Amino acid sequence: MNLSVKLPGLNLKNPIMPASGCFGFGKEYSEYYDLSLLGGVMMKAATQFERLGNPTPRVAETSAGMLNAIGLQNPGVQQIIDHEVPRLAKYDTSIIANIAGSSIEEYEFVAASFNQTTDVDALELNISCPNVKEGGIQFGTDPFMAKKVTEVVKKASNKPVYVKLSPNVHNIVEMAKAVEEAGADGLSMINTLTGMKIHLPSRKPLIANKTGGLSGPAIKPVAIRMIYEVRQQVSIPIIGMGGITSAEDVLEYLIAGADAVAVGTANFQNPFVCVDIINELPEVLEQYGFNSIEDVIEKRGITV
């Protein structure tokens, strides 16, 4: 069965990618399976200079997901270009670089830096991280700022730009339309929902940042609803994410309006989850009457 999907800058052999922030740069997972099996790899966020991230503890389990406040820890864009991209480029898969910053100028610098390499196929513009004090969410909750940083990154880069949207907004359709008007080639949605968990004996938050981003199965219904709403109002492709653990979840995302998906938290529970989903997808598509991913996309839409 044909699982391929064509998106701006990305010829995916299948629609399955590990989500940025949940897969590092793929080094540990490459010890489990051949990364060439993946439709693509969304690398961990890159900033201009090295970031050490937030104080520990930075991760806490919840009943239906995970809270994290990593804080965009990364070695800096030049280290990523010099060491991580060449290693990933040995695999037959698409590479998407997630870019972040504390200012518009930093976003511009990081986006322009990735022009150094032809091995990066597209950029994912991270304006939705809830766990940093500067940058990130301040751009992702204001349509004017989201549009402005998208325009700057588009001018700085010769690669397609997918803007990662935050669910922590009043109107996500307004955000999606703003970045589409700014020239975004696609959307990634959704990032994590802001949450908190308290240790009862001490009455202290379980993570040092007090609040963190909630991911995992708990947020899937929110993501499906937001993708469905955005799909009715914008025409650019959507890479859907949030609580995907199975091939059935992937089909649900595609029907709601996504064109490809990214798998995040489930990688921590089962390092083979992406490969498992790729293997199970043909049977699930056939079960529900589809003969390819493009067939789902052409026929998608919910019945009422």
Swiss-Prot record:
Q: Which reaction does it catalyse?
A: (S)-dihydroorotate + NAD(+) = orotate + NADH + H(+)
Instruction: Write out the entry's keywords from A to Z.
Output: Cytoplasm, Flavoprotein, FMN, NAD, Oxidoreductase, Pyrimidine biosynthesis
What's a GO cellular component annotated to this UniProt protein?
cytoplasm
Q: Where in the cell is it found?
A: Cytoplasm
Named from the GO MF annotations, one term is:
dihydroorotate dehydrogenase (NAD+) activity
Chain ranges passing through the membrane: none
Q: What does the record's cofactor remark say about binding?
A: Binds 1 FMN per subunit.
Query: Which positions does UniProt annotate for substrate binding?
Result: 44, 68-72, 126, 191-192
Q: Which Pfam family is an annotated match for this chain, by its short name?
A: DHO_dh
Q: Could you say which EC number(s) this protein's record lists? A: 1.3.1.14
Q: Does the keyword Cytoplasm apply?
A: yes
State where FMN binds. 20, 44-45, 98, 126, 164, 190, 216, 242-243, 264-265
Q: Where is the active site?
A: 129
Major location category of this protein? cytoplasm
Superkingdom of the source species: Bacteria
What pathway is this protein said to act in by its record? Pyrimidine metabolism; UMP biosynthesis via de novo pathway; orotate from (S)-dihydroorotate (NAD(+) route): step 1/1
Q: Which GO terms describe its biological process?
A: 'de novo' pyrimidine nucleobase biosynthetic process; 'de novo' UMP biosynthetic process
**Entry function:** Catalyzes the conversion of dihydroorotate to orotate with NAD(+) as electron acceptor.
Q: Please state which protein family the record places this protein in.
A: Belongs to the dihydroorotate dehydrogenase family. Type 1 subfamily.
Q: How does it assemble?
A: Heterotetramer of 2 PyrK and 2 PyrD type B subunits.
* HAMAP family on file: DHO_dh_type1
Full protein name? Dihydroorotate dehydrogenase B (NAD(+)), catalytic subunit
Q: Which gene encodes it?
A: pyrD
